[in-house]
Structure formats: C-alpha cells, structure tokens
C-alpha cells in the first residue's frame, strides 16, 4: 500500500513539474536538451568527421538555431528568460 502511495505521489510531482514550467539556462539548458533529444547527441561536439549537413540537417545551421519551425523565438528566449514546460522544450529537438 505504501509503495502505491509513493508511486502515485511521484507521478503527481512529475506531472506538476512538466505543467508548471522551469527556467533552463546555460549548461542546465544544454544538458536538459541533450538528455531529452538523444538524436541530437554529438551535434555540439567539435571533433569528429561530421559535416554541417550531418549536424544540422539539410536546412543548415540557421534553421537549427531558430528551432526548426518555431519562428523567431529561440530556445533561450522561450526557456531561459521565461519559464517553459518540458513539452515546450521537446519542440526544440
């Protein structure tokens, strides 16, 4: 019974954290994006034989910097200067 109560409490905390939103800045922002977007792993590494097309796709670095189709607001404006939810942060993957 206690296990179920702890499990429900943990699920509630996780859901509240994703709804409430947090500020993600600097290293915390980059580490969170790296954790949430494993397909982007290695894109920020300077070593290796990756070309620009492999790192940023065929649309180039400007498209990646803008967050794809997110418009003019970038991930820093959205999640550092203001709070954002984990769902909003996932849109930058």
UniProtKB/Swiss-Prot annotation:
Subcellular localization, as worded in the UniProt entry: Secreted
Record keyword Aminoacyl-tRNA synthetase present: no
Positions of the propeptide removed during maturation: 47-71
Signal peptide: 1-21
Keyword Disulfide bond: yes
Record PROSITE patterns: INSULIN
Subunit structure, interactors included: Heterodimer of a B chain and an A chain linked by two disulfide bonds.
Membership in a protein family: Belongs to the insulin family.
UniProt protein name: Bombyxin-related peptide B
Species, as recorded: Agrius convolvuli (Convolvulus hawk-moth)
The organism's taxonomic lineage, starting at the top: Eukaryota, Metazoa, Ecdysozoa, Arthropoda, Hexapoda
């Amino acid at each position: 019974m206690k296990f179920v109560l702890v499990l429900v409490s943990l699920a509630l905390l996780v859901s509240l954290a994703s709804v409430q939103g947090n500020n993600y800045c600097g290293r915390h922002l980059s580490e969170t994006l790296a954790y949430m977007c494993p397909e982007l792993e290695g894109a920020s590494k300077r070593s290796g034989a990756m070309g620009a097309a492999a790192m940023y796709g065929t649309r180039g670095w400007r498209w990646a910097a803008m967050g794809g189709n997110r418009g003019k607001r970038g991930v820093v404006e959205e999640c550092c200067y203001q709070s954002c939810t984990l769902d909003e942060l996932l849109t930058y993957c």
